[in-house]
Regions:
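Secretory targeting signals
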Residues: 3, 10-17, 26, 35-89, ...
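Membrane-interface junctions
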Residues: 30-34, 96
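Interfacial "coupling" helices/loops that link adjacent transmembrane helices in transporter permeases
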Residues: 94-117
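Cytosolic juxtamembrane amphipathic/interface segments immediately preceding
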Residues: 21-30
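Solvent-exposed, acidic/flexible segments
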Residues: 21, 92-93
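C-terminal and late-domain segments of enzyme folds
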Residues: 204-206
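Short cytosolic juxtamembrane segments of multi-pass membrane proteins
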Residues: 243-247
Length: 247
């Protein structure tokens, strides 16, 4: 009996492992084969290159600068691609038959949501790291401050991707999710003059405080937590919609 029980447990563990592997593989395959994701990556990459070229052309001969000095401006352009990628990743699930295919591959919706979150997080970290790393290397000056700024930028861009994807999954509308993400992430910093201190509670302005790190450590940490709360809330809303919806 004990031998049979051990065998059953091994088989159950193997089955769960296989199910997780299948779910992760399916989600990764969707991300890398979705044309909109590649277009979004191209937009982000082009924005990064254009921003760096503009900065380098305007630098006075012999004047050095590090990534920490251009990170906020650089990110304002690059994050547009990450917003588009997040909305596209979620939108493809509902604007096409991809959502039903996902459920056929991974019927357990909780596992599907977790696999999707892990794949998107990994994708965001890799894509952001590549772009930030290339821009860091292009800067004339390298320092610990530049590396810290690069790390904060990677975290922010990944959060933008997850926030947009969460909005897309929750709203199930490409137009609605795009509008909400653009307002929250891109327009809020531009409206900070009119919104005053209230702007700090929106992810876009909080992200700028997080990136510049020019304020007190408490304010920077608070900004990071605000971004985390917004991202978590958007993802949780998307997960709840996935688990409770009919398809």
């Amino acid at each position: 009996m004990s031998g049979a029980g051990a065998t059953s447990r091994v088989r159950a563990t193997a089955g769960v492992t296989t199910a997780w592997g299948r779910a992760l593989h399916a989600e990764l395959l969707k991300v890398v084969t979705l044309p909109a994701m590649w277009w979004s990556a191209a937009v982000a990459g082009a924005a990064a290159i254009a921003t760096m070229m503009s900065v380098l052309q305007n630098v006075v001969d012999g004047q050095g600068f590090g990534f920490e000095e251009i990170a906020p401006t650089w990110t304002l352009a690059v994050q547009i691609g990450f917003v588009a990628a997040g909305v596209a990743a979620a939108g493809a699930e509902h604007s096409t038959a991809q959502g039903m295919t996902s459920l056929l591959v991974t019927p357990a919706r909780g596992r599907l949501a977790a696999a999707r979150l892990m794949v998107l997080t990994g994708t965001g970290l890799v894509a952001a790291s590549v772009m930030v790393g290339a821009s860091l290397a292009a800067c004339p000056t390298m320092s610990a401050a530049a590396l810290w700024a690069g790390g904060r930028t990677v975290v922010w861009l990944t959060a933008v991707l997850l926030l947009a994807a969460g909005l897309g999954a929750a709203l199930r509308s490409v137009i609605g999710a795009s509008t909400a993400a653009v307002v929250l992430v891109i327009l809020t910093p531009q409206l900070a003059v009119f919104l005053g201190d209230a702007a700090r509670w929106f992810p876009g302005q909080a992200g700028q405080i997080w990136l510049t790190a020019a304020e007190s450590q408490a304010d920077v940490t608070s900004a990071g937590l605000i971004v985390l709360v917004w991202t978590t809330a958007a993802q949780m809303a998307g997960i709840v919609r996935l688990v409770r919806a009919d398809a």
